[in-house]
């Protein structure tokens, strides 16, 4: 979890992981962290759509870390996705310090 190569923004952005919609906890040009009931194993390949700056951006990535939740007490798990493919415009926007103010 500490091998990040880019700054993260504490933003709740709508993304999909496959067909499942989730919200990010934080996001940056290198990837994002999300909270969900069922986490995927580290190393799993994922793809989906980011909704940023009023546009959809497709991505591909890999699960970098996970922390399983506990369904018995309705505690969600968390996982981090490292981008392996991201459109250049989306990466540029996510690197921008102004991203925190963009809807």
Question: What do the PLM-derived regions correspond to, one by one?
Answer:
Residues 13-17, 43-56:
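Short conserved beta-strand and strand-loop elements enriched in small hydrophobics
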Residues 26, 38, 63-67, 85:
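A residue-level detector for short acidic-glycine micro-motifs
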Residues 71-103:
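C-terminal output/interaction extensions
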Residues 1-29, 95-103:
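N-terminal helix initiation/capping motif
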């Amino acid at each position: 979890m500490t091998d990040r190569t880019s700054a993260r923004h504490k933003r709740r952005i709508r993304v999909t992981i496959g067909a499942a919609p989730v919200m990010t906890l934080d996001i940056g040009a290198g990837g994002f962290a999300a909270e969900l009931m069922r986490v995927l194993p580290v190393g799993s390949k994922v793809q989906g759509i980011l909704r940023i700056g009023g546009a959809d951006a497709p991505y591909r990535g890999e699960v970098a870390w996970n922390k399983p939740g506990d369904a018995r007490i309705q505690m969600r798990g968390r996982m981090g996705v490292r981008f392996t493919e991201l459109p250049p415009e989306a990466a540029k926007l996510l690197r921008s310090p102004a991203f925190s103010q963009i809807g």
